[in-house]
Amino acid sequence: MPSLPVLIDTTTEFDVSSPQNVTQKRSLLLAPPSIAAHEEKLRDIFTTFDRSVTDLQMLDRLSAGFVTLPASTYDLVLVLTDTNGARRNEALELLTRDIFNILTPSMKPSAQLQLQDGPFQANEGREAILAGLVEKHGAFEKPQYQEAAVPLRFGANKRKNKISPEPVKIESVGFVDNYDDDELINEDDLLDEEDLGKPVQQPAECQPETAKKRRRACKDCTCGLAAQLEAEDAERREKANADLNVLKLKTDELNDEVDFTVQGKTGSCNSCSLGDAFRCASCPFIGLPAFKPGEEVRIMNDMAQL
């Protein structure tokens, strides 16, 4: 019996490979209000971007809160400023902090914010930086934050067997009771009539050496020294007042004439005629002008008569 040829089909009947899910990147176009009057520019833009994955929003409506953006949706945010930068200033003025507060949550991690006519200048990205975006190659990118769990160990190194120290013994001190019921003894009750009749003996410390310093009585002196010193001071004051009265001139003595031309009839200081600067404290010419020696001076009714 002749052999028949065998044909083997090597083509696969089915594909077991898993289908690849390709997610297209979404873009957001932000246009200033003036571009609405130029439909041809919008048509030119949509020739570059796919309408199915591209959204167009007006900056003024977004700033007024008329439009809400979905969270974590866009991979690219492009601000339409024309290729020649004709609407750059208008668009940058509308990119306020309120716009970034709405725009930043709608961007995916690693999404970029770009201008149509070129990179951002150094002074044009302050609000973007404050919103949390990072400058990268003339554009701003939303950083990709990674969450990680960090274990916290509180006091792990302190969990060791520690030997408790022995309690410190406090040395006891004498117990003092200030509120005892003991009655105070009157010192006068300990003296009899014979003790009360004895003279008071002055302590030795109340008799200091008078040659070196004046005696001084104690504040609560009971030996009689304070009374003795007070009596001596009163006697000294009386003597000083008496000596002062001797120097005072009476009314009839003020009318006496002092003649400096007669020998022996000068003042005690011999300076009565020189003026108050040279007169003694008890001079009757105090307050009068200076006069020449030998000039007759009379004091009549407290007035100098030259």
Swiss-Prot record:
GO terms for biological process: cellular response to oxidative stress; iron-sulfur cluster assembly; negative regulation of hydrogen peroxide-mediated programmed cell death; negative regulation of nitric oxide biosynthetic process. It comes from the Eukaryota. Coiled coil: none annotated. Residues 21-150 are annotated as: N-terminal SAM-like domain. [4Fe-4S] cluster binds at residues 269, 272, 280, 283. Residues 151-196 are annotated as: Linker. Gene3D superfamilies: Fe-S cluster assembly protein Dre2, N-terminal domain (3.40.50.11000). A motif (Cx2C motif 2) lies at residues 280-283. Residues 269-283 are annotated as: Fe-S binding site B. Residues 206-223 are annotated as: Fe-S binding site A. One of its GO terms (molecular function) is metal ion binding. The keyword Plastid does not apply. Keywords: 2Fe-2S, 4Fe-4S, Cytoplasm, Iron, Iron-sulfur, Metal-binding, Mitochondrion. GO terms for cellular component: cytosolic [4Fe-4S] assembly targeting complex; mitochondrial intermembrane space. [2Fe-2S] cluster binds at residues 206, 218, 221, 223. Its cofactor is [2Fe-2S] cluster; [4Fe-4S] cluster. A motif (Cx2C motif 1) lies at residues 269-272. It is found in: Cytoplasm; Mitochondrion intermembrane space. InterPro entries: Anamorsin (IPR007785), CIAPIN1 (IPR046408), Dre2_N (IPR031838). PANTHER family: ANAMORSIN (PTHR13273:SF14). Monomer. Interacts with tah18. Interacts with mia40. Belongs to the anamorsin family. The C-terminal domain binds 2 Fe-S clusters but is otherwise mostly in an intrinsically disordered conformation. Component of the cytosolic iron-sulfur (Fe-S) protein assembly (CIA) machinery required for the maturation of extramitochondrial Fe-S proteins. Part of an electron transfer chain functioning in an early step of cytosolic Fe-S biogenesis, facilitating the de novo assembly of a [4Fe-4S] cluster on the scaffold complex cfd1-nbp35. Electrons are transferred to dre2 from NADPH via the FAD- and FMN-containing protein tah18. This is Fe-S cluster assembly protein dre2. It comes from Talaromyces stipitatus (strain ATCC 10500 / CBS 375.48 / QM 6759 / NRRL 1006) (Penicillium stipitatum).
